[in-house]
Amino acid sequence: MMNQMRVSGLAAAFAGAILAGGAAPAAAEAPESQDPIKIALFDWTSVNVNANILGGILKRLGYNVELVPADYISSLTTGLTTGDITVALEYWDTTAGEGMAASDATGQTERLGALGPKAKEEWWYPIYMKEKCPGLPNWEALKDPKCAEAFATPDTAPNGRYLGGPVTWEGFDDERVQSLGLPFTVIHAGTDAAMFAELAAAIDRKDAIMMWIYSPHWAPAKYEGEWVEFPEHTPECYTDPKWGINPDMAYDCGKPFGEIWKYANVNMKTTWPVAYNVAKNYTMDAKELGLLGGQVDLDGKTIEEVAEAWINANESKWRGWASSGS
C-alpha cells in the first residue's frame, strides 16, 4: 500500500465529514435515495483526497454523504459486504490482491474498475546509499553484511533497518526478509505521515534509509532513488513454498505490481444509480494524484481545500461522469 501519497493529516481527512464542495444542489439533481452514501477513508493521503473529491461531487448532486474511517484490507470482506461502506476508491494490486479475491467471492461487492494509475510498492533507497552498497538495485546486494551494516541503526545493528508501512498495509516484508535470508530487521511505521517524515529527515541529513515507497506518490518524484529489484512476483510465490529460490518458504519474491481498483457494495447501482455512474467513471491519473497529495503533505493544504479546488476546476468532467452510463 501502499503516497504518490498517504496522510500527514489523517485526522483532517476524518474531519472531512464536512465535505468539500457542499454547495446546494439544483432541484433537478435530487437523489434517488436519501440514505447516506458511505465512502471509505484509509490511512494515506491519496485515497482520502479521492474520497473527499468523490464525496464533494456527490454532495453537489444532492446526495447525503458520509466519510467513514475503515481498515484497508478487512473492509473488503466486512464493511463493503455489509453495506457499512458503500464505496472505496483505492485497493492496490500490490497489497490487497488476496483481500479483493475474497471480496469478489462473496457476491456482495462489485469491482468498479481501475482508478487509472499503475501501482508499485517496493523497498526503496536514496541514490546516495548506492555508494555504500554498490550491488544495488539487485536484491542480492542486501545479503552482504557490509551492505546491511550501511543501513543499520543502533537498534538493529548489525542488521540493516527496513522501514515498512503500517501493519494494516500487510505487504509481507517480515516474511520476505526471512525467506530470502536478508540480514535486515523490519520496523513498521505507525502511520503513513510518520514514515514520510522520517524519509524527509533522513535525506536532509544524508542518513541511511531503506523503506517502503509506493507510486503514485510525490516522494519518488521529489527524491532521487531506486527500488530494490527482487525476484519477479508471481501468484505462486505467495502460495507455494516450493516456488522460487527458497524451496521451504513462500514470499521469496518482490511485491506484485498492477492496478488500483475501486469497489462498491453490490446495492449501490440500484439504490443510487447516478452516484454509481460517478463512482464507476471516476478516474485520476498518476501525475495529477501525485500533485494533489503533494499539496497536502508538502504544501500544508487541507485535504478538503485540495478536493474543493479540484471539484471547482473540473465541473465539466465530473458532470460527464454523472450523465454517462456505466
PLM features per residue range, with description:
Residues 85-89, 161-239:
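Ligand-binding pocket segment of bilobal, Venus flytrap-like solute-binding proteins
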Residues 120-132, 258-271, 294-295:
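A bilobed periplasmic-binding-protein/Venus flytrap-type ligand-binding module shared by bacterial periplasmic
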Residues 51, 68-107, 198, 218-223:
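Pocket-flanking alpha-helical
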Residues 31-46, 63-69, 159-163, 279:
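Short, well-ordered beta-strand elements
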Residues 34-37, 46, 169-185, 189-206, ...:
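An extracytoplasmic/periplasmic, membrane-proximal ligand-sensing/linker region
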Residues 44-45, 63-78, 187-198:
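Short helix-initiation/N-cap motifs at beta->coil->alpha
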Residues 219-282:
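C-terminal lobe and pocket-closing loops
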Residues 108-162:
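A conserved helix-loop-strand patch within extracytoplasmic ligand-binding domains
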